Regions:
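Short amphipathic, basic-aromatic surface patches that mediate peripheral association
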Residues: 48-54
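Glycine-rich, aromatic-bearing surface loops/beta-hairpins
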Residues: 98, 129-192
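Bacterial signal peptide processing site
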Residues: 18-21
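Structured domain cores in non-transmembrane regions
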Residues: 55-134
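Positively charged n-region of N-terminal signal peptides that target proteins for export
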Residues: 1-4
Length: 192
């Protein structure tokens, strides 16, 4: 029992330190597989931010996909950062609840060119899986880079920032990260 408690405490601490809600961990673990089967038109990232926040010109989150075969002959490795496009909402929309007073949603989806690129990546994986000689598998990493968006006025640096994700319209959005723009910038600097 003591060991179970320590594991729970460790998981809780880890999630709290990174800003990832514990309830999201099971869905995040399924994300790579879901992305390979997802309709690219359904994929969206929603940010709930202070209503005064204005994204820097040209700054958009990127869908980062890294796909590496164990056997380099199986298929060509993929390392792509696909740009998303913006829509703004101050009311309930797309299954998201209305933001509290003083906040708004920035909703990012895949533009047509990015949808086509994601479909190409999905086809590459399906083709590799269908190939009888493909037995070795590979690694798939999926993330959403949003550090460029966090460049904000100092007055907003410590306001709440929530990141929500949808891979399939039927499943809706789920929260994947919460913190502040300052924390987001700090994470982006660590990744460089």
């Amino acid at each position: 029992m003591k060991r179970l408690f320590l594991v729970f405490l460790l998981c809780t601490t880890l999630a709290a330190c990174t800003g990832v809600p514990l309830r999201s961990l099971p869905r995040l673990m399924q994300l790579p597989g879901q992305l390979l089967d997802a309709n690219p038109a359904d994929f969206m990232v929603a940010l709930q931010v202070d209503a005064r926040f204005v994204p820097p010109p040209g700054a958009v989150p990127m869908l980062a996909i890294e796909l590496t075969p164990r056997d380099p002959a199986a298929f060509q490795a993929v390392n792509k950062k696909l740009p998303l496009q913006l829509a703004v909402a101050s009311a309930a929309t797309l299954g998201l609840e209305a933001p509290p007073l003083g906040r708004r949603w920035l909703i990012y989806s895949l533009p047509a060119a990015t949808q086509t690129e994601l479909q190409r990546i999905q086809a590459t994986v399906r083709q590799a899986k269908a190939n009888p000689s493909y037995k070795s598998g590979g690694n798939l990493g999926v993330g959403v880079e949003q550090g460029s968006l966090a460049e904000t006025a100092p007055a907003l640096a410590n306001t709440r920032w929530e990141t929500w994700l949808q891979t399939q319209k039927a499943d809706g959005f789920f929260e994947v990260w919460s913190g502040t723009p300052a924390q987001l910038q700090q994470l982006a600097r660590k990744d460089k």
